[in-house]
Regions:
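Extreme N-terminal basic, low-complexity initiation segments
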Residues: 2-10
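Basic, polyanion-binding surface patches
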Residues: 33-241
Length: 241
């Protein structure tokens, strides 16, 4: 690890206005941006990061939470949060989560070909956290976390009744990740097509889903770090022509 300085010369802030930027709430101001000299911490991941905590998770953040419900072939239901989760395609709508080991969720989805994703919100934060407990395969995290399973309409997997948004999904593919050198990582990316969507109508205003109304929570850096998304944090930025 080593530190080095990046110097950008002839910085002209008056030429760095951001076109199309409009804030939706009072108190948020548009400012000019200027890149200046930085004292950089540099490292190569293969040699270690040299910090108290690996910054990778904190840099690639915030990340939506993959709160995944699944059912085993014998009917046992599972609920677990995953911090590596996102959407990957519009048509068809595809979401995916990565598991850092072959866990019950992945096994269940491979066996049945189905799963549900449930939106984790501020109101459900403690319940979501409780469902992360390492328990025996036959223990239901729904019951452990005090949540209500509701049968899916398309898939045979329950969703979280208390969550304002849920997706029913069918398995697209499970991929074992690998490094640039071709070595297999102990991580599996599970991708699924969204075949049904459940939205609390209170989250919809004038025909538009309002992300902030649900107060979603998203993963930050260390094991216990999260952010809450609020309506007042939103701003709109129109793409240039």
């Amino acid at each position: 690890m080593r530190k080095h300085r990046t110097v950008v010369r002839n910085c002209a802030p008056e030429n760095l206005e951001i076109p199309g930027l409009r804030f939706a709430h009072p108190g948020m101001t548009e400012g000019k941006r200027c890149v200046t000299a930085k004292d950089l911490h540099f490292y190569e991941p293969k040699n270690g990061h040299g910090l108290k905590h690996d910054p990778f998770n904190a840099i690639v953040a915030p990340r939506p939470i993959g709160w995944i419900s699944s059912r085993g072939p014998k009917g046992n239901i599972n609920l677990a949060p995953y911090s590596f989760f996102n959407a990957f395609c519009y048509v068809p709508p595809i979401i995916g989560f990565s598991s850092t080991s072959w866990k019950d969720s992945v096994q269940n989805i491979q066996d049945t070909g189905e799963f549900c994703w449930n939106l984790a919100t501020m109101d459900l934060a403690r319940h979501m956290n409780a469902s992360a407990a390492h328990v025996a395969r036959d223990v239901s995290e729904f019951e452990l976390a005090g949540l209500t399973p509701v049968p899916g309409k398309i898939v045979g997997v329950p969703r979280v009744a208390e969550s304002p948004v849920s997706f029913e999904c069918k398995l697209s593919q499970i991929l074992q990740l690998q490094g640039a050198d071709g070595r297999k990582a102990q991580a599996w990316l599970t991708l699924g097509e969204v075949v049904a969507v459940h939205i609390d109508k209170a989250m919809i205003k004038d025909g538009v889903y309002q992300t902030g109304l649900a107060h979603p929570i998203v993963r930050a850096g260390r094991k216990g770090d999260y952010f809450e998304i609020k309506p007042e944090n939103m701003f709109e930025m129109v793409r240039p022509d």
